[in-house]
């Protein structure tokens, strides 16, 4: 019962003495404290140098209470003091550990806070850099877009100018073509008139050819062709009997040819017989070649037997050769290199032999018709070569096997060496263990010399250890025996390797001998091939002789045929002379008819040439149109390529996103693998710690058993009174020894406990990391799902963009068509303008006469010029005959605004065209659109400024008209080409309005206003450039010579036609303007959609970057 109580007390003291509340994780600190306590067991003054008594000392003192002996109370007091000091030390240690842990916790929190702040600052810096980069990219993109638009507008202007120039050239070509067609038709009519005069027949019964219309020429030509066909059929009827005569002559010539062929066959048979005699001689030569081949075969068999004998000798000599492993390796490497080179040479020789054999085969096939017996010999040679190749392949396989064996032996040698090294390391480790065990045994023997019973136990332990030593010695002996056996195996393997190298060398020699024999055989084969070539040459010579004979025979036959044909021709000529004398008159008539047919056919050819020229002109026009369409196609392709580039960029971004997703997946896989590795390491560590704890527990149990034995011995020793002090002293010595052991065990236990706590912390940390990784996996999975959804959205958007791109391409095609229509309409309007101005000039030509007596009564303005600050007032008073080269630079705007301006200018020009009337009657016939235009112009300009300018101009014009009446000049009617620059500014177009006097009898006076630019009408009404530069500008006020009724009758139809065309053009232009506006709206919608998509893509990219960060 007392022992149990002591044990319970000691167990209560253990946790207080060993473990602390805080539990510091540093084993170094614990060991240092233990060192200080053990060293200073005698001093009791300071706290840090007090002795440390474990529970075993208390348990040893517990049985002493029952048996009093001198010095017992002193020991108990000392023990109590020691226990109080230990408790105080434990409290202070716990407090210091708690303070240390708090400081660590605060430091960790501060470090974490600083890291978070650093991350936030880095995020902000990256965001600012991204924003700046995006702004710079957006600015560069906007600049590039503006530059592209400017370039496209310049290209469009250049294309319009080129189109106008091409249209003017095409118009001139068409005029020339019309003139040439008219000349051709006149020539056809003259040819038909000549045909009527020559034949005396009338093609048309009612009308003559000179008065016939061009449309009826086709029917007349068809009649002539029908008549010619009837005449040709009549001539063909006469040709048939002549063909019958020719057939009879052909049959006779065929009979003669058959006779000649029979003679030729007889000669060929003779030549064949001679050729067979020559073939028999060649067969004899072939038989001799076969005998030589048999002799070669026998020699090859002898060589094979020699090679076998040599191989047997080599196998016998393999057991006698020995060498070291290092020499073996070097020799093997060198032999391998040499052998590979030789094998390559042999393979090359085999390839050459195969190529030569294939050539021999082809030559044999060609010569098989003449010498078929040589095939057997060549086949035998080929069989021999195949046998040699098989033997070489077998030798190669044997060499490979030997090499594999050598490599295997070298590998086994390396493994054995490694095992030897491992065993040596184990032996060294066992020796170190033996030394450690010996040292431990010696220490135990020295400690237990005082105790008699302890000596017996130590002897038992020594005996067990000696048994273990003997067992380890036996293991070492076995290992040494195994090593010796392995060394023997290594030596035997080295010998076999040396034998194999010797055999390889011998085989190489045999291969060299076989190669020499093969070269000899090749030389013989070459000789045989030379003989075959000689025979072939002889055969070719015979064939050439045969071909020459056949050619001579054919020449003879042809000459015979020619002689017979000449004879037949002479006979036929004699017969035909009489017939030709009869049919000479008929032939002359036919000749005349044929000449007529030839002339007709010539005319048809000329017509066909004319049609061909027309088609060529059409083809040229179509080619010009095709070139224009190609230019437009290039523009559309460029636009489409830009759109495709944008789509490709989007795809590239999508691929980048997919690559990033893949990288994230790979990172997750790597993290999962690292997590598994950490799990495995933790399991291994936990198992090791468990094993160490089990060992320490076993040691504690053994120590406890030893303590129980010492207690029993103490109980037995208490009976003896005289020897009590001696036993006590001995026991104290034993106790001091045991205390050292117990202290060591306690330090180990504390170290293990600290390791367990650290392992638990690591386990907790790993659990936290696992939870973090699981959270990160969940977040990555959610992000992956989001990215998949966003990718699907992007794909749908790409599909929509593709559809929109297709729609935009269709719209661009329509826009190009609209541009074509606008250009055509402009060309038509310009053409109508030119026609109208030409008609007006023709009507005005005789009416312009200089008259200085007549003065205008009323002056009204018709058009207002744009005032320019740089132009002086003297230039504003010049008349419509002066030429000005000043042009204003219009700013570059959008293509839609340019189109609108062009449309407005065309409307003004079309509305101003009817204002070119010269009399009151022409004013009465104007359309209401002219009055509206005049009202607008008059409302826009103040009357005072206009009257002053007009008065000044009228005075100047009257002075100049008086001077210019002496030298009147004629107006030039040369048309001036219209440039697109003349239509850009509406103020550049001149308008001419005439107002009647109140009485209606006086002629209308005219006021002309000049502008910095020339209008097309102005350029048409003015004289040539040289006259305009040399002569002074004059203003002419004239009276019309013709009556008003005649003027009205002559100009009313032209005004009506121009009015109708102008209305049509206005309607078309309005429809085109609406189309252009619709297209502009669609383009704006598309641009807005594209911008929105770009913004979404940028948002997605920003989100991805944030997630990655």
Swiss-Prot record:
Q: What species is given as this protein's source?
A: Mus musculus (Mouse)
Query: Where is the region Disordered?
Result: 1-31, 843-897, 952-1061
Q: What ranges does the record list as Basic and acidic residues composition bias?
A: 1-12
Q: Which Pfam families match?
A: CCDC158 (PF15921)
Could you list this entry's UniProt keywords, alphabetically sorted. Coiled coil
Where are stretches of biased composition, namely Low complexity?
999-1019
Top-level taxon of origin: Eukaryota
Task: Provide ranges: composition bias, Polar residues.
Answer: 17-31, 862-882, 953-970, 988-998, 1020-1037, 1043-1061
Coiled-coil regions listed: 71-166, 242-828, 1053-1109
Q: Does the keyword NAD apply?
A: no
Which Gene3D superfamilies does the UniProt record give? 1.20.5.340
**Designated name of the protein:** Coiled-coil domain-containing protein 158
């Amino acid at each position: 019962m007392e022992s149990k109580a002591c044990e319970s007390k000691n167990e209560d003291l253990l946790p207080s003495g060993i473990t602390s509340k805080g539990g510091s994780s540093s084993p170094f600190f614990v060991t240092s404290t233990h060192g200080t306590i053990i060293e200073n067991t005698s001093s009791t003054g300071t706290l840090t140098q007090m002795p440390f008594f474990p529970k075993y000392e208390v348990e040893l003192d517990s049985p002493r209470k029952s048996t009093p002996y001198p010095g017992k109370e002193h020991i108990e007091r000392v023990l109590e003091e020691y226990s109080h000091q230990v408790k105080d030390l434990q409290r202070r240690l716990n407090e210091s550990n708690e303070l240390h842990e708090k400081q660590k916790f605060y430091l960790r929190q501060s470090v974490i806070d600083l890291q978070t702040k650093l991350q936030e600052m880095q995020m902000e810096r990256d965001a600012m850099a991204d924003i700046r980069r995006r702004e710079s990219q957006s600015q560069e993109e906007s600049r590039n877009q503006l530059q592209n638009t400017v370039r496209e507008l310049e290209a469009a202007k250049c294309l319009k100018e080129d189109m106008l120039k091409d249209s003017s050239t095409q118009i001139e070509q068409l005029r020339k073509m019309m003139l040439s067609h008219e000349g051709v038709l006149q020539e056809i009519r003259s040819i038909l008139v000549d045909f009527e005069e020559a034949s005396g027949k009338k093609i048309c019964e009612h009308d003559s050819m000179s008065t016939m219309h061009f449309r009826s020429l086709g029917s007349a030509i068809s009649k002539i062709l029908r008549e010619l066909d009837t005449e040709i059929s009549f001539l063909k009827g006469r040709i048939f009997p002549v063909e019958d005569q020719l057939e009879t002559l052909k049959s006779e010539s065929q009979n003669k040819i058959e006779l000649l062929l029979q003679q030729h066959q007889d000669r060929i048979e003779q030549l064949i017989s001679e050729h067979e005699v020559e073939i028999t001689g060649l067969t004899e030569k072939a038989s001799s070649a076969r005998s030589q081949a048999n002799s070669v075969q026998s020699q090859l068999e002898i060589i094979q037997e020699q090679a076998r004998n040599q191989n047997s000798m080599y196998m016998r000599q393999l057991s006698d050769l020995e060498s070291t492993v290092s020499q073996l390796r070097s020799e093997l490497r060198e032999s391998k290199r040499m052998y590979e080179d030789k094998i390559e040479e042999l393979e090359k020789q085999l390839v050459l032999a195969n190529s030569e054999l294939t050539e021999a085969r082809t030559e044999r096939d060609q010569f098989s018709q003449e010498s078929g017996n040589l095939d057997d010999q060549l086949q035998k040679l080929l069989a021999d070569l195949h046998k040699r190749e098989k033997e070489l392949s077998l030798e190669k396989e044997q060499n490979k096997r030997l090499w594999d064996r050598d490599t295997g032996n070298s590998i086994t040698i390396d493994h054995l060496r490694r095992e030897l090294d491992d065993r040596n390391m184990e032996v060294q480790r066992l020796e170190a263990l033996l030394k450690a065990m010996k040292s431990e045994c010696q220490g135990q023997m020295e400690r237990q010399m005082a105790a008699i019973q302890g000596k017996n136990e130590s002897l038992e332990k020594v005996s067990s250890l000696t048994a273990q030593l003997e067992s380890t010695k036996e293991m070492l002996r076995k290992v040494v025996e195994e090593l010796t056996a392995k060394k023997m195996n290594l030596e035997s393997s080295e010998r076999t390797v040396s034998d194999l190298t010797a055999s390889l060398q011998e085989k190489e020699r045999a291969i060299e001998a076989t190669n020499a024999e093969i070269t000899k055989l090749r030389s013989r084969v070459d000789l045989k091939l030379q003989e075959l070539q000689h025979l072939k040459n002889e055969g070719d010579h015979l064939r050439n002789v045969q071909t020459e004979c056949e050619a001579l025979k054919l020449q003879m036959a042809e000459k015979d045929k020619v002689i017979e044909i000449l004879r037949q021709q002479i006979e036929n000529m004699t017969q035909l002379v009489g017939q030709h004398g009869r049919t000479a008159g008929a032939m002359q008539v036919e000749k005349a008819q044929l000449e007529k047919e030839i002339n007709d056919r010539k005319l048809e050819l000329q017509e066909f040439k004319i049609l061909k020229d027309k088609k060529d002109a059409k083809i040229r026009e179509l080619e010009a149109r095709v070139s224009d369409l190609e230019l437009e196609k290039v523009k559309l392709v460029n636009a489409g390529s830009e759109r495709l580039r944008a789509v490709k960029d989007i795809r590239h971004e999508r691929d980048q996103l997919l690559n990033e997703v893949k990288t994230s997946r790979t990172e997750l896989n790597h993290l999962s693998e690292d997590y598994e590795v950490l799990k495995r390491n933790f399991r291994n560590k936990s198992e090791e710690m468990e094993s160490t704890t089990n060992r320490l527990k076993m040691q504690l149990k053994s120590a406890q058993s030893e303590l129980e034995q010492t207690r029993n011995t103490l109980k037995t020793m208490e009976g003896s009174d005289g020897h009590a002090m001696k036993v006590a002293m001995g026991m104290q010595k034993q106790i001091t020894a045991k205390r050292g052991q117990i202290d060591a065990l306690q330090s180990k236990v504390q170290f293990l406990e600290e390791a367990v706590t650290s392992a638990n912390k690591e386990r907790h940390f790993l659990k936290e990391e696992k939870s973090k990784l699981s959270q990160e996996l969940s977040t990555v999975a959610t992000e992956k799902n989001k990215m998949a959804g966003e990718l699907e959205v992007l794909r749908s958007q790409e599909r929509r963009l593709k559809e929109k791109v297709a729609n935009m391409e269709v719209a661009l095609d329509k826009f190009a068509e609209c541009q074509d229509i606008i250009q055509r309409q402009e060309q038509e309007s310009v053409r109508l303008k030119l026609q109208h101005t030409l008609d007006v000039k023709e009507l005005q030509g005789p009416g312009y006469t200089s008259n200085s007596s007549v003065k205008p009564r009323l002056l009204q303005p018709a058009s207002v010029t744009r005032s320019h600050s740089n132009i002086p007032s003297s230039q504003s008073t010049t008349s419509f005959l002066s030429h000005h080269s000043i042009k204003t630079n219009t700013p570059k705007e959008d293509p839609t605004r340019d189109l609108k301006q062009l449309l407005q200018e065309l409307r003004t020009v079309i509305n101003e065209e009817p204002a070119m009337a010269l009399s009151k009657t022409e004013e009465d016939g104007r359309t209401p659109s002219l009055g509206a235009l005049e009202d607008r112009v008059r409302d826009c300009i103040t009357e005072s400024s206009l009257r002053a300018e007009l008065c000044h101009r009228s005075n100047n014009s009257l002075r100049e008209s008086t001077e210019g009446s002496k030298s009147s000049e004629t107006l030039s009617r040369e048309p001036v080409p219209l440039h697109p620059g003349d239509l850009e500014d509406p103020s550049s177009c001149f308008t001419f309005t005439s107002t009647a006097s109140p009485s209606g009898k006086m002629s209308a006076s005219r006021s002309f206003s000049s502008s910095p630019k020339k209008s097309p009408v102005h350029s048409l009404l003015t004289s040539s450039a040289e006259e305009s530069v040399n002569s002074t500008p004059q203003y002419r006020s004239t009276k019309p010579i013709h009556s008003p009724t005649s003027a009205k009758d002559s100009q009313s139809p032209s005004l009506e036609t121009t009015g109708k065309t102008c209305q049509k053009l206005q309607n078309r232009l309005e429809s085109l303007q609406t189309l252009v506006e619709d297209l502009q709206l669609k383009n704006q919608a598309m641009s807005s959609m594209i911008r929105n998509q770009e913004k979404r893509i940028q948002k997605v990219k920003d989100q991805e970057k944030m997630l990655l960060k």
